[in-house]
């Protein structure tokens, strides 16, 4: 790998902060790091890494909904591996992807820190993305008075306050019937692309009465059959039910976190996978406990063997739902589940049950 040319702005994004980068293969993303988000990722992943896969009773640990955290990258420096043994094993498995990450191109004298995360879009051919921000309360105790007042107004005047969630943005394949439903202020057409970006103004303009129509719009893909669209909605309903159960067991507080919906809009990939979707994302890295029996396979890892990052184009999912954005999240032992998040998930469940 070269250095500068291997980092580019993340192409597909429905909302969020500017400055998110990806590597040349699109396997990883590099997201500007906030101290609280970094600590949350480390704490959750260290706690849950041994039970990342769904347990026998069907529950899923919180980390199974989150992008895999791989470490920290400083501008002008190589990846800084975690000292935690559980994470170190994952870091070592990714050596082929990270050993040559010499630096992120520096654009200012002040060095930045980046979270190194699994790219949730990796493996999708034509991803369609929906970002749903959870919660009625949109600020934490550290927010300034000005931000508190501003976020209160946003909550009070949008579905955040009434329903516990708000559509933050979408990036979907162009569809004439969708464009006919949208005012020009709500979307941008990308030049030389078959995508449109639906901005936050659209989400803020939705009401209790029409927000379900906005979610229907997300699934209104001109390249997929009605049967495939119906399958997607039912699969996301199952995910929401499972995620709801996860959050009832978690003692955390998450402000302005989002659910990221992704589905495949390329019918050829649907055919390649025989329309078979997976409820949960595959582990980013296979974690085989019998490593000692597979020492002879070490040389194959660099070529994408079963113990390296998977070829998700042929083995991955046709859709996924993930929890993202933890700059204002923390573990809160003894305080019970997060009602601020639970209320929004309950409303989403009601909507998807009616599809």
UniProtKB/Swiss-Prot annotation:
Keywords: Acetylation, Arginine metabolism, ATP-binding, Calcium, Kinase, Metal-binding, Nucleotide-binding, Nucleus, Phosphoprotein, Transcription, Transcription regulation, Transferase. The keyword Transferase applies. Its cofactor is Ca(2+). The modification Phosphoserine is found at residue 97. SUPFAM superfamilies: SAICAR synthase-like. The modification N-acetylmethionine is found at residue 1. Disruption phenotype: Impairs nuclear mRNA export, slows cell growth, increases cellular InsP3 170-fold and decreases InsP6 100-fold. ATP binds at residues 31, 118-120, 131, 325. Substrate binds at residues 127-135. One of its GO terms (biological process) is negative regulation of transcription by RNA polymerase II. Its EC number is 2.7.1.127, 2.7.1.151. Pfam families: IPK (PF03770). GO terms for cellular component: cytoplasm; nucleus; RNA polymerase II transcription regulator complex. Ca(2+) binds at residues 271, 274, 334. Residues 284-304 have a biased composition (Acidic residues). It is found in: Nucleus. InterPro entries: IPK (IPR005522), IPK_sf (IPR038286). Residues 284-317 are annotated as: Disordered. Its main location: nucleus. GO terms for molecular function: 1-phosphatidylinositol-3-kinase activity; 1-phosphatidylinositol-4,5-bisphosphate 3-kinase activity; ATP binding; inositol-1,3,4,5,6-pentakisphosphate kinase activity; inositol-1,3,4,5-tetrakisphosphate 6-kinase activity; inositol-1,4,5,6-tetrakisphosphate 3-kinase activity; inositol-1,4,5-trisphosphate 3-kinase activity; inositol-1,4,5-trisphosphate 6-kinase activity. It catalyses: 1D-myo-inositol 1,4,5-trisphosphate + 2 ATP = 1D-myo-inositol 1,3,4,5,6-pentakisphosphate + 2 ADP + 2 H(+); 1D-myo-inositol 1,4,5-trisphosphate + ATP = 1D-myo-inositol 1,4,5,6-tetrakisphosphate + ADP + H(+); 1D-myo-inositol 1,4,5-trisphosphate + ATP = 1D-myo-inositol 1,3,4,5-tetrakisphosphate + ADP + H(+); 1D-myo-inositol 1,4,5,6-tetrakisphosphate + ATP = 1D-myo-inositol 1,3,4,5,6-pentakisphosphate + ADP + H(+). Belongs to the inositol phosphokinase (IPK) family. The expression of this protein is not effected by the presence of arginine. Present with 2720 molecules/cell in log phase SD medium. Inositol phosphate kinase with both monophosphoinositol and diphosphoinositol polyphosphate synthase activities. Able to phosphorylate inositol 1,4,5-trisphosphate (Ins(1,4,5)P3) on both the carbon-3 and carbon-6 positions to synthesize inositol 1,3,4,5-tetrakisphosphate (Ins(1,3,4,5)P4) and inositol 1,4,5,6-tetrakisphosphate (Ins(1,4,5,6)P4), and then to subsequently phosphorylate and convert either isomer of InsP4 to inositol 1,3,4,5,6-pentakisphosphate (Ins(1,3,4,5,6)P5). Interacts with ARG80 and MCM1. This is Inositol polyphosphate multikinase. It comes from Saccharomyces cerevisiae (strain ATCC 204508 / S288c).
